[in-house]
Amino acid sequence: MKQRAALGPVLRLAILALLAVSYVQSQATCRDCSNRGCFCVGEKGSMGAPGPQGPPGTQGIRGFPGPEGLAGPKGLKGAQGPPGPVGIKGDRGAVGVPGFPGNDGGNGRPGEPGPPGAPGWDGCNGTDGAPGIPGRPGPPGMPGFPGPPGMDGLKGEPAIGYAGAPGEKGDGGMPGMPGLPGPSGRDGYPGEKGDRGDTGNAGPRGPPGEAGSPGNPGIGSIGPKGDPGDLGSVGPPGPPGPREFTGSGSIVGPRGNPGEKGDKGEPGEGGQRGYPGNGGLSGQPGLPGMKGEKGLSGPAGPRGKEGRPGNAGPPGFKGDRGLDGLGGIPGLPGQKGEAGYPGRDGPKGNSGPPGPPGGGTFNDGAPGPPGLPGRPGNPGPPGTDGYPGAPGPAGPIGNTGGPGLPGYPGNEGLPGPKGDKGDGGIPGAPGVSGPSGIPGLPGPKGEPGYRGTPGQSIPGLPGKDGKPGLDGAPGRKGENGLPGVRGPPGDSLNGLPGAPGQRGAPGPNGYDGRDGVNGLPGAPGTKGDRGGTCSACAPGTKGEKGLPGYSGQPGPQGDRGLPGMPGPVGDAGDDGLPGPAGRPGSPGPPGQDGFPGLPGQKGEPTQLTLRPGPPGYPGLKGENGFPGQPGVDGLPGPSGPVGPPGAPGYPGEKGDAGLPGLSGKPGQDGLPGLPGNKGEAGYGQPGQPGFPGAKGDGGLPGLPGTPGLQGMPGEPAPENQVNPAPPGQPGLPGLPGTKGEGGYPGRPGEVGQPGFPGLPGMKGDSGLPGPPGLPGHPGVPGDKGFGGVPGLPGIPGPKGDVGNPGLPGLNGQKGEPGVGVPGQPGSPGFPGLKGDAGLPGLPGTPGLEGQRGFPGAPGLKGGDGLPGLSGQPGYPGEKGDAGLPGVPGREGSPGFPGQDGLPGVPGMKGEDGLPGLPGVTGLKGDLGAPGQSGAPGLPGAPGYPGMKGNAGIPGVPGFKGDGGLPGLPGLNGPKGEPGVPGMPGTPGMKGNGGLPGLPGRDGLSGVPGMKGDRGFNGLPGEKGEAGPAARDGQKGDAGLPGQPGLRGPQGPSGLPGVPGFKGETGLPGYGQPGQPGEKGLPGIPGKAGRQGAPGSPGQDGLPGFPGMKGESGYPGQDGLPGRDGLPGVPGQKGDLGQSGQPGLSGAPGLDGQPGVPGIRGDKGQGGLPGIPGDRGMDGYPGQKGENGYPGQPGLPGLGGEKGFAGTPGFPGLKGSPGYPGQDGLPGIPGLKGDSGFPGQPGQEGLPGLSGEKGMGGLPGMPGQPGQSIAGPVGPPGAPGLQGKDGFPGLPGQKGESGLSGLPGAPGLKGESGMPGFPGAKGDLGANGIPGKRGEDGLPGVPGRDGQPGIPGLKGEVGGAGLPGQPGFPGIPGLKGEGGLPGFPGAKGEAGFPGTPGVPGYAGEKGDGGLPGLPGRDGLPGADGPVGPPGPSGPQNLVEPGEKGLPGLPGAPGLRGEKGMPGLDGPPGNDGPPGLPGQRGNDGYPGAPGLSGEKGMGGLPGFPGLDGQPGGPGAPGLPGAPGAAGPAYRDGFVLVKHSQTTEVPRCPEGQTKLWDGYSLLYIEGNEKSHNQDLGHAGSCLQRFSTMPFLFCDFNNVCNYASRNEKSYWLSTSEAIPMMPVNEREIEPYISRCAVCEAPANTIAVHSQTIQIPNCPAGWSSLWIGYSFAMHTGAGAEGGGQSPSSPGSCLEDFRATPFIECNGARGSCHYFANKFSFWLTTIDNDSEFKVPESQTLKSGNLRTRVSRCQVCVKSTDGRH
C-alpha cells in the first residue's frame, strides 16, 4: 500500500505533463492559414466523458428467432472406432528432409529357415571398398553419467549478494547416518524431585514353572526369522496307507496333512565361488546441474561400428509376384525346433488291437522318498489380525537399548563470537578446469614439433557403438549371399507359375544359432489364404525333447504355496535402514546413584540483608513430586552399540515409484496365443514329404478326442504272471477324420519335477530397501530371543526399612533466595568457563574525554576515495629512444584494389587481321542514336513523272508491324443493325469460373410485413418438363422478396434460348491472369466479322504479370461457350488505334552520386575516469588471460617532440584486397586494335522480360493529311515526378569545321550575355578534392534557456552503503528470536601457499599474445556510403546571400548521357574552309518538287549559300492543365517483400527509403521474437545468419556462441538436400524495400479464392495470399496482424521461410517449420463442423484465402 500511495502523485504529475506537451504540440501543428488553405494535421483528441443516460425507449415488438447458438463444449472422447479399411496408395511425396539418425534397433527375431537352394557358382573375392566419406558430426549425445566429484576449487571472491527471503520449508530428508559421538554436554539443570522409583532388581531366576495353557494369538507382528536349527533325527516310518487299486504298478495314496516343521538344519558346506553378480543399482541421481551452453560442433569422429539392425518396419504393401529366383546354396540344417503349441484334436481312431492281458498284484507300493522341496511360493496375502493375547509374565530386565533416531534439528542458535584467525589451510587440490574462454585471435602457424615417443598401448574400454557412417563406395560384386528371409506372399494376379526347380542336395550341418526371445502371444491373425488340400499326409514322428526355452514373462501371482524345506543358512546381510521408532517402553528400574556433580554456578544474590543462620540437619527424603514438563530436547548422544533388531513395523503406505530396477531374468514361456481365424483352403500342390524333424518336446496335452470303439476284451493273464507286458507296436495311422471344431485350450499340465538347487551365489551388495513384503508362513521356532519389554509396573509394595545411606546425590536445583543475614565473603572461586556472547547492549552515555592513548596499530586499508580533479596537462617529454622492433603483425586482411594507373601511351596501330568468317545474323539491335548530319548533297534534277505500273503479285501477309503513331480519333459510326441470330453452337467445354461481377444495385426496400407464423416446409416439386424457349418480355417491377423455398430436384436441360442482344461493354474486372487452359478441340471457322467501332478508354487496370501476348478483344457478354475455331487467315493490318492512356511512370532513376561530405563535428568531451578498485593480494601467476576490452581514451597530452626514427619492423603479411579505388583520369585514346576472329554462334537466348520503351524511331514518311476533328479530352494522367532540368541548348547550325587554331591569349572579361535557356540538370560530378580546413567561425548566439523537464520518477532503492563508524556498546537486550542469515563476511586473509599439486594435464592452446606495437598508418579507406538525408531546414524565407567566390575546379565528371538536341541557335560566323570531309551517307530522297515554269536553259550555276533561317512560328494552342503535384507526405511507411532475389520496386508515386532482406523473426534463449512483415523493422539492410548478440548482467556479451536462430522469408529456390552455407545462402533469402506511402495502408482478406475489393476511397497496391502465422523450432514463432500489409504475401508457398542457425552459419528447411494461412470459408459452411481434408501439391492454393493491400486515396487532399 505504501508503494501505491507513493505512486499516486507521480502518476498525476506524469499525466499533467503529458497533457501540457500535447497542448503545445497541438498549438504548434497548425500554422497561419489565412492566406492560403493549409493542411493541418491535428492529433486525435482523447475520448470525452460519457453523456447522461437517456430516457428508456419503448418496448419493441418481438423479434425473429435468433441464429443458431455457438457450438457446445467439446464432447468427451469417443470410444476407439474399428480400424478403417486400407486406403488407396497415395501419390509419391516430395523428397523429405533428411531425418535424424534413428536409435539402434533391438535384435530381430531369427527368421524361419529358408528352403535349401541349388548350389551357386563360387564368386571371386571382392576387394575392400574405399573408406566412406567421413560423416558429419552427429548431434550432441545424451548427457553422460555424473562424473566423480571434482576437487575443491580456490576460494571465490565474495559476491555482493543481498539477503534473500527465507525459502519455503524443505521436505524432510532421509534419516542420516548416526553421527560421531559429540562432546559431553554441560551439566543440565538439576531435575525436580522424581517420582517414587520402581521395585529393585529382580532376584535370581527361579525354577521353571509348568507350561501354561497356550494363550490367545498375540497382536504383535511376526518377528524376524530365526537362525536355522540343528538337523532333526529321521522320524519313524509312517503307518501303511490304505489300499487302493489303480491300474498299474505303484499306487499313489491321498496326500497327507502337512507334517510338523522339522528342526533347523545344519549349515551346509561352503559352495563354490558363484559367477560374478550383476552390476549394482545406479546411484541416486545427482542434483541437476546448471544448464550448460551448447558446445560447438566437435570434429568429425571416426567411423563407428555398424549399428545393430533396426526394428522391423511396418509391413509394406503387398507386392506383385516376383520372378522365380535362382536356386540358393543348400541351407544349413536348422536347429532343433522349440516345442510346438498343442495340436488340434486328431480324428477319431479305429478300434485298436486287443490289449495285453491285464492283471497285477494288488499290494500297495512302498511310499516313495520325499520329493525335493518345491520352489518357494509367492508371498500370500496378509492374514487377518489375531485376537489380542493375555499379558505375559514380566521378563527380565533388558539390556540397554540402542540410541534412538536423531531428533529434529533444534532452533538455530545465536551467532557465536568471532573466532581467532585460523592457521593456514593445507594446500587444496588443483581446481577443475574453468570453462573455455572465448576463442582468441588466430595465432601464426607454429613450427612442426618434434616427433613424440611412441605411446603405450593400454587397451581402453570398448567404446559405444558409433552412429553409422556414410555409405562407402560400392565394392566389387561379392559372392552370392545366403538366401534371404522369405518375403510375404505376392499377389498371384499377374505372374505365371514357374517351372518346378530341381531338388537341391542337403547342406552340411550349420552352427547353432542363438535362441530367439519368445515374443508375447500375438493377436489373432487375419484370415489366411486358402491352403492346399493334403490328401495323404502322415503325422510326423514325435521329436526329441528340446532344449529348455528362455524364461517367459513373469506369470500372474500364484496361489499360496506350501511351506518349503528350510534353506541353508545365508550369510549375515548388511545392516538394514533403521526401522521406525518403537513405542516408548515402560519405565525401567531406578539406576544407582551417580557420582557427586561439579559445584554449581554461583547463585543470584538475594535482596534481603539477613545474616545466615547455623546450618540445619539434613532433611528426610521427600516423596516423589509430580512429573515435570518435558524438557527441551538434548543434544544427540554418542552412537550406542547396535541394538537387537526391532519388531517389524506395520506395513507402510505405498511409497513413490522407485528408480527402475535392473532388468530381470527372462521370464518363462508365455501361454500360447489364441488360435487365429480359420484360414481358407489354399490352392497349392502337395509338397514332397519332409525329412523327419528332430525330436521335439511333448506339446501340451490336447483335449481328449472322441473315444474310439471299444476294443475286444483281452485274454485273461495266467494267475502267476503279474508283470505287465511291453507295449505293442503302434497301429497304422487311421484315415483322417473330419475336421473337428477348435477345442477350448487344454488345462495346464502337471507341475514338473523341481530342479536341483543351484549353488549358493556370492553375497550380493545390499539393495535398496524394497517395499515391505507380505507376511510369510510362521517360521520354525527360533532360539530364545532377547529379553522382552519390561512389563507394566507392579502394585506398589509395602514401605521398606530404612536403607543404608547412599552415595551423596547430585546437586539439587538452585534454591529460592534465603532470608538470612549476609555471610562472610567467601574465598575466590575458580575461574568459570567462558560464557556465550551476549547480545549487543544499548548505547551507554558518553564517557568523559580520556587521556591520549598510545599510537594504534596500522589500520586496514581504506576504501578508494572519489576520483580527483583532472590535473593540468604535463609538459612535453623529452624525445624517447628508439623502441625495439615490434613483433611481426598478423597477416593483414587483403588490401583494397589500388587506383588505376596512368593510361599508357597509345600503341602503334596493328596490322589488319584476316577477314573473319561471316557471322550468324544477330538479333535485332536497339535503335542507335541519330548519326551526325552529313553534308547536304547537291540537289538532283527533278525527274519526269513515270507511267503507272501494273499491279504486283499480292505479297505474303507480313508480320505484325510495330504500333504506329497514334492517329486522330475517327468519327463515331452509326450503330449497326442487329444481325440475324445464328444457329446455336454445340455446347463447349465448361469454362473456368468467371471473374466476380459488380454488385447489382439495391432494390427498393419492401414494406415490412407483420410477423407471420412459421409455415411448414413444402415438399420438393416433381421434375418439370422442359419449356419452350422464352422470348424477352418487358421488365416487370421488382416484387417483394419472398421466403426462399426448398430446393427442388434438378430439372432437365431446356432448349437453348434465342441468343440475346449484344450487351454493353462491361467494366473491366480486377484479377490476375489465370492459368492458361488446355487447348480445346478446333472449332468450325467463323465468318469474318465487320470491324467494330473503337471503344471508349477504360480505367487503368492493375499491372498484371506479363502474360502471353494476346489479341485485344472487346469484352462481350458471355455467350454460350463455343469450341475453339480453326485458325483464320491472317487479316490485313488494321488501322491505327486510338491513342491510349498515358503509361505508368517509369522506374525511378539510379541513385545519385554520394553527396559532399558533411562538416566535421566538434570533438565530444571525454568521460570521467572510473573509480580505481582495491588492490588485491598478490596471487599466484594465473593462466594467460583473455585480451581485455579497450580502455577509455585518455585526455589528449601535449604534443611531444619528434622522436628518432625506429628500426624498421618486420614486414607484415599480405593484406586483404581493398575497396575499389576511384576512377583515374581519362587516358589518351588508344589506336584502333586489330580485328578479332569471329566467335562461334551463341545458343538461342531465353525470351527476355519486356524491355523498357525504346527511343523513338526515325520519323517515317509523311502521311496523308488526316481529318482534324478534335477528339474527346482524355482523363488526366497520374501525377508525374518532377523532371530533371533540361540541357543547355545547342548552338545553331554547325559551320564547317576549320583547322584547329592555336590557343589564343585570354581575352578581357566581356559583359554578361543574355541568359540562355536553362540547361538540363547534369549528373552529379565526382567528389571534388577536399578543400583546406576553413577558419573557425564566430561563436553563435547563446540559445534560450530550455523548458524545465518533467519531474523524474522515483529512483530505485540504492545498494547497501559503506559501513559506518562503530557505535557505543548498548544495554544488553532481551534474547531475540533467531535472525535471518547474515550477509557474507569479509574476505579472509590468504592462507599460506600450498605444496605443489599433481601436474595437470596439458592445457589447451593459450590465447593470442598481447597485441604488438602499432603498425604504420594504413591507407585511407574508401568513402563510406551516402548518409541518410538530413532533416528539412526551417521554412522561414531567408534573404539570399551575396554571390560567393568561384570554387576550385572539380575533378572531371563522369561522362554524361547524351542530351536531347537543343534549339537552333543563331548562325555562327563563317569559319575558314575545312578540310574535305569523308563522304557522308546518302540522304533520304526528297519529296518531289512542284513542277516549275519552264525556264530558259541556262548554264548550271553553282549552288547558292544557305538561306537565313525562317522566323519563329505562331504560338501553339495552350496545353491541357497539368496534373496535381506530389502529395504532402505524412510519413506513412510501407514494406514490400518480393519473395525473390530481386529488390522489389515501390508502387507508383512512392519513394523508396531503403532496401534489404526480409527478416521474419529471431529466436534466442529458447524464446522467439516476431517481426510484423508490414513494418519497416522486417527489412534489414544487411543479412547475417546471426543478426543479434546477447548480453547478461555481468557486462558480458556473447555473439554466435549458442544455439540462436534467425528466420527469413525465402524465395522459390528448390529445397536443398543439406543445409547451405555462406554464398550458397543468398539465392534463398527474399529481398524487400521500404517505401514512403502518401497515406495509410491496410490489408483486406476475402476468405475465399476471389480477390477482395478495396473499400470505397481506397486503391489497390497488390494482391496476394493471406499469411497468418508461422512456427519453427521448439514450437516458437509468431504471426501477422490481419490488418497489416505483412499478412498479404504476393506468392503462396507451403514453406515461405527458411531457418538459419547463427553459430553454424548455415540455413535449411527443417521438418518442424509450419506456415499457417487463412482458409476459404463458403457461405453455407460458416457454423458447421469443418471437414478434414488433405491437399496434395498442385491443389494447395484452392483452400487459401486471397487478399489485397489497399492505400487510402489522396485525390481530394491539397
From Swiss-Prot:
Limits of the Collagen IV NC1 domain: 1531-1754
Basic and acidic residues bias: start-end ranges: 189-198, 258-267, 464-479
Documented effect of changing residue 1286 to D: In g37 and b246; 9% lethal. Moderate reduction in basement membrane localization associated with a moderate accumulation in muscle cell cytoplasm
GO biological process: cellular component organization; embryo development ending in birth or egg hatching; gonad morphogenesis; protein localization; regulation of distal tip cell migration
Superkingdom classification of source: Eukaryota
Effect of residue 588 to R: In MN103 and MN151; 96% lethal
Ranges of Gly residues composition bias in the record: 102-111, 268-283, 398-407, 693-702, 737-746, 782-791, 859-868, 958-967, 988-997, 1194-1203, 1251-1260, 1373-1382, 1492-1501, 1507-1516
SUPFAM superfamilies xrefs: C-type lectin-like (SSF56436)
PTM annotation, UniProt: Prolines at the third position of the tripeptide repeating unit (G-X-Y) are hydroxylated in some or all of the chains. Type IV collagens contain numerous cysteine residues which are involved in inter- and intramolecular disulfide bonding. 12 of these, located in the NC1 domain, are conserved in all known type IV collagens.
Segments of this protein annotated with the region Triple-helical region: 42-1527
Keywords assigned by UniProt, alphabetized: Basement membrane, Collagen, Disulfide bond, Extracellular matrix, Glycoprotein, Hydroxylation, Proteoglycan, Repeat, Secreted, Signal
Tissues expressing this chain: Localizes to the basement membrane between distal tip cells and the germline. Localizes to the intestinal basement membrane.
Free-text note on domains in this protein's UniProt record: Alpha chains of type IV collagen have a non-collagenous domain (NC1) at their C-terminus, frequent interruptions of the G-X-Y repeats in the long central triple-helical domain (which may cause flexibility in the triple helix), and a short N-terminal triple-helical 7S domain.
Protein name: Collagen alpha-2(IV) chain
Organism: Caenorhabditis elegans
